[in-house]
């Protein structure tokens, strides 16, 4: 029996024993980002679900993906096998456990996957570095503040993002926040008998290469993107770069009120949080999307700002060059008196770098209106579908 089949059977059996026992209550790392948080509570077991993610333009199929936890090294398998919903995306998580079931956080990851665009297999059987385990424990123990509901929330999903070239990221997620905890895990290219990897696909296509070519058609635009752009293996190294900057939003009309509870930031390294979060980021990756609400003259305005990938990469690279890498910057969004002009810039030291190609949507609604509809007040990208605003490697 092949190693692939043994891996699947052993881990699924181990997991099944836990399900029954609880009566359904339930590489080498070069550098990983460490999250510094204070402990609150001493829990070491939590209700969590593992999942896998991959870029929309670079889908993967897993032979197995197992998160190993506990002294008995029990495996928690990811049941879904196809992934292309986006980096750090937790939506593929399938939680079959009862709400009260809790487990220790994972210590090891075993994964085998087929990179469909590369037509290559990658494999990893690696210990999660101790500092990353500590970071996850701190985050799960502390949870996070969700300013919209003014509630304390919990992390409940651990996302393994599989990238071209065998790179892997670990992100922890909850309803209202995502935090990248490790960005430098690495798998190695390997050889697998395609018949063992996917027997049904083997019977239909006979070879992995034919299967991958056909599978590209399952994803909108992926084949065309591959032909036009190829695979930018170093792009995700750019995405994970962090800089010391703050985000400032202000208005020409000083009577305008920013509803900070709804101000959200999404970054290129999968980090996502609200401005009212009580554990704000000091070092941030480049922004991908910023959304916020402001109130003025009896109207509520909702703004969605999607940054241009090429521009935001180049501007941050130039502003935080080797000479200014350690300086603190300010990403400034200024809104005009009539809410229809938007000046965006990155300011580092005495230098200002304009961001002129940001895609902006603004919706308007009268405060107190019972209508569920919002008027499109401003749109500088009318001919662009919102799905097209995703970055290449997202």
Write out the residue ranges for each language-model feature.
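N-terminal secretory signal peptides that target proteins for export/translocation
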Residues: 1-13
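Sec-dependent signal peptide recognition
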Residues: 15-25
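C-terminal motif of bacterial Sec signal peptides marking the signal peptidase cleavage site
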Residues: 30-31
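An N-terminus-focused feature that recognizes amino-terminal "leader" regions
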Residues: 37-68, 93
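Contiguous beta-strand segments within globular domains
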Residues: 39-54, 228-249
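Tryptophan-paired
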Residues: 67-115, 256-314, 393
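Short beta-strand elements
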Residues: 124-135, 141-146, 304-317
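Compositionally biased low-complexity segments at domain edges in trafficked proteins
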Residues: 136-234, 319-389, 393
